[in-house]
Amino acid sequence: MAAALAVRGAVSAPAFGPEALTPDWENREVSTGTTIMAVQFDGGVVLGADSRTTTGSYIANRVTDKLTPIHDHIFCCRSGSAADTQAVADAVTYQLGFHSIELNEPPLVHTAASLFKEMCYRYREDLMAGIIIAGWDPQEGGQVYSVPMGGMMVRQSFAIGGSGSSYIYGYVDATYREGMTKDECLQFTANALALAMERDGSSGGVIRLAAIQQSGVERQVLLGDQIPKVTISTLPPP
């Protein structure tokens, strides 16, 4: 998952003397990576993510589930520090559950996104968390919200995040079109994630997908031999 940890005020290791033989791992930035995505369609949303969790060059987990349920019809995609995003997701799930009980009705997707925004903004100096919130509610139907690091919130027709997203902005912008069906969104998401996993060394593993509609949540996992092989010849015409 995409994050960076560094010691504040750290100085570089000396070039000479006994200290030069000491590893400077405390001063190095430890990077991790991920690729997450969500797309809105008429009647619901599709979410997707890779499953690799890394710490620098070390792969800590090959089958991480980065699609986290927040409520019955609301999920989030997590990028950043795994510990930070898990803690934030747990806190929002807890608050949203109480909110739903008080109102005696399912929560709105916008409410869930606002809770993420408030927490990510309040603790922006301490958190490494980029979140995509997507789901369905009776008022607005399918919705996708992005809360990047820092706590800004914006609603979008689709959102991508994580270190792998840098490699697929062009593909996503060129390929996305309004009015896609659920199956088209699932294929679109799988293709985009496969492209990111091909280029980003911090993204990999399997592809996890979820489609959320009024009828419920459908989840699927694409294993290695099921991940799309996207080439120039397989791309749709412009």
From Swiss-Prot:
Prosegment location in residue numbers: 2-33
GO biological process: proteasome-mediated ubiquitin-dependent protein catabolic process
Location(s), subcellular: Cytoplasm; Nucleus
EC class name: hydrolase
SUPFAM superfamilies the UniProt entry points to: N-terminal nucleophile aminohydrolases (Ntn hydrolases) (SSF56235)
Enzyme Commission number(s) of this protein: 3.4.25.1
PROSITE patterns tied to this protein: PROTEASOME_BETA_1, PROTEASOME_BETA_2
GO cellular component, as recorded: cytoplasm; cytosol; nucleus; proteasome complex; proteasome core complex; proteasome core complex, beta-subunit complex
Reaction equation(s) it catalyzes: Cleavage of peptide bonds with very broad specificity
One Pfam family from the record: Proteasome
Modified residues (Phosphothreonine): T68
A GO molecular-function annotation: endopeptidase activity
Catalytic residues (UniProt): T34 (nucleophile)
Keywords from the named record: Acetylation, Cytoplasm, Hydrolase, Nucleus, Phosphoprotein, Protease, Proteasome, Threonine protease, Zymogen
Predominant location: cytoplasm
Family annotation (Gene3D superfamilies): Glutamine Phosphoribosylpyrophosphate, subunit 1, domain 1 (3.60.20.10)
InterPro entries: Ntn_hydrolases_N, Pept_T1A_subB, Proteasome_bsu_CS, Proteasome_sua/b, Proteasome_suB-type
Family listed: Belongs to the peptidase T1B family.
Role noted for this protein: Component of the 20S core proteasome complex involved in the proteolytic degradation of most intracellular proteins. This complex plays numerous essential roles within the cell by associating with different regulatory particles. Associated with two 19S regulatory particles, forms the 26S proteasome and thus participates in the ATP-dependent degradation of ubiquitinated proteins.
Quaternary structure, from the entry: The 26S proteasome consists of a 20S proteasome core and two 19S regulatory subunits. The 20S proteasome core is a barrel-shaped complex made of 28 subunits that are arranged in four stacked rings. The two outer rings are each formed by seven alpha subunits, and the two inner rings are formed by seven beta subunits. The proteolytic activity is exerted by three beta-subunits PSMB5, PSMB6 and PSMB7.
Record protein name field: Proteasome subunit beta type-6
